[in-house]
């Protein structure tokens, strides 16, 4: 009888003890672990590694503000060394500015030649003699008139350009003899058809200057009053300058195609002659 009672008590103790442990394991143990986690010091987060290109560009910026051959080489080295730098857009803009300035310097661009104007010369005649382009000679010499003076020194540019439009960045990049020349930000971009997707090859089909419905030749007295644009084909894409404000101050809407600031369009109109290849991607 006593043995039976002891056995029952032992079974009851076993059941109650197991239940107590189960409650502890299910509730109190988790609570204790939560408390430990809450009071434990946070796991230290490693500091991000500083981008060395930022410091390198900051050090180079004073030199990059100058338009010298040495400064240009330093910027080229930076771009080659840090092709993924967050400062790459700034460096590319500086390089483009330098290239444009130094292109008009025969010491910096020895491929360009100098021509001394002779009696009976005209821009058209000089362009024919030097196998150049009238508008490119006018542009590179920053002329304000087609009238020339005997003995006047004219720079004859060495240009063999191509262009790449990058949709995602909304930029038009010009290359000369296969090397980066300058990157131009696009003000407005509207592309359709094949030009709007994938990699699309086209070329300059025409460079147009019109006054009303009449086409005007370069050098004509009313050429400055014309509306100019560049036509690309295939793709029926056009390049335009941004519209100027109307007399009442309102700004007309941008035309479809590729729209650049007026200053940038003036460069592009001269740099991209008929037949120049353009890649859109």
Language-model features, listed with the residues they occupy:
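Primarily a LysM-type cell-wall glycan-binding module
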Residues: 45-69, 74, 102-131
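Short beta-strand-centered segments at strand-helix junctions
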Residues: 215-219, 250-271
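Loop/turn positions that initiate beta-strands
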Residues: 120, 151-154, 275
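Extracellular LysM carbohydrate-binding repeats and other cell-envelope/extracellular binding modules
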Residues: 80-110, 133-166
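N-terminal Sec-pathway targeting helices
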Residues: 1-15
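Hydrophobic single-pass membrane-insertion segments
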Residues: 17-35
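Gly/Pro-biased beta-strand-loop elements
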Residues: 158-246
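Alpha-helical solenoid scaffolds that mediate protein-protein interactions
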Residues: 39-42, 78, 82
């Amino acid at each position: 009888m006593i043995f039976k009672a002891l056995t029952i008590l032992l079974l009851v103790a076993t059941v109650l003890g197991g239940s107590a442990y189960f409650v502890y394991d299910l509730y109190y143990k988790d609570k204790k672990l939560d408390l430990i986690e809450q009071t434990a010091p946070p796991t230290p987060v490693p500091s991000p590694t500083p981008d060395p290109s930022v410091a390198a560009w900051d050090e180079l910026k004073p030199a990059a503000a100058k338009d010298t051959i040495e400064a240009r080489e330093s910027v080229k080295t930076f771009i080659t060394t840090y092709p993924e730098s967050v400062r790459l857009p700034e460096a590319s803009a500086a390089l483009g500015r330098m290239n444009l300035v130094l292109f008009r310097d025969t010491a910096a661009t020895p491929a360009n030649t100098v021509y001394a104007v002779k009696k009976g010369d005209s821009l058209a005649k000089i362009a024919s003699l030097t196998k150049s382009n009238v508008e490119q000679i006018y542009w590179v010499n920053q002329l304000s008139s087609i009238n020339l003076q005997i003995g006047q020194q004219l720079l004859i540019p060495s240009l063999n350009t191509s262009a790449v439009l990058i949709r995602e960045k909304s930029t038009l990049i010009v290359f000369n003899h296969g090397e980066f020349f300058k990157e131009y930000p696009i003000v407005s971009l509207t592309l359709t058809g094949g030009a709007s997707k994938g990699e699309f090859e086209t070329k300059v089909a025409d460079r147009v200057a019109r006054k009303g419905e009449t086409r005007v030749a370069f050098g004509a007295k009313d050429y400055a009053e014309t509306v100019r644009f560049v036509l690309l084909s295939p793709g029926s894409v056009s390049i335009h300058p941004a519209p100027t404000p109307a007399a009442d101050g309102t700004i007309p809407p941008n035309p479809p195609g590729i729209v650049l600031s007026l200053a940038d369009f003036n460069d592009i109109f001269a740099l991209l002659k008929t037949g120049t290849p353009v890649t859109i991607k």
